[in-house]
Amino acid sequence: DEELRAALDEMFRHSSVLLAQEFIPTEFDWRIGLLDGEPLFACKYYMAKGHWQIYNHAHDDTGRNLCGAWETVPIYKAPQKVLDTAVKAAALIGKGLYGVDLKLINGRAVVIEINDNPSIDHKVEDAVLGDELYYRILNHFVHCLNRLHAQ
């Protein structure tokens, strides 16, 4: 109790708000990429070996960060509960480009975070759609700009 209070006091020196989240260990997180409210890509991000996150920022002997594997799957192969929850979560923010990270626990999809600037890496998030992924994203932003310009 005393150790927790000391840690909280230290954290509150740097921020007026703290967010606590239940630790839910899983083999991987789902990342559902959404564009304009629709699922765009689905990836499994596996935890770094011997670590509780997908990235282990404690460097290995070469000075590189250690990261877990990934697996990109077609949207139709992602669990429907994960897709539905990702769509609902992102809708609370808007219809832009989002990456929603979730865990599936006993049939329950739990949102871990919503990224408004999701990473889209070559041969990772684009592994299923290829160049079509980038075409869809660029086309979306061109339409947004055209709507703004027309006003």
Task: List the model feature ranges, each with a label.
Residues 1-30, 80-84, 148:
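Active-site nucleotide/adenylate-binding loops and adjacent lid/helix of ATP-dependent enzymes
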Residues 21, 100, 112:
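Active-site flanking residues adjacent to catalytic metal/cofactor-binding acidic residues
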Residues 25-26, 37, 105-108:
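Short strand-connecting beta-turns/loops that link adjacent beta-strands
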Residues 31, 43, 101:
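Short, surface-exposed charged micro-motifs
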Residues 38, 44-47, 114-119:
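Short beta->alpha transition motifs characteristic of CBS
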Residues 49-59, 120-129:
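A short, polar/charged loop-to-alpha-helix boundary motif
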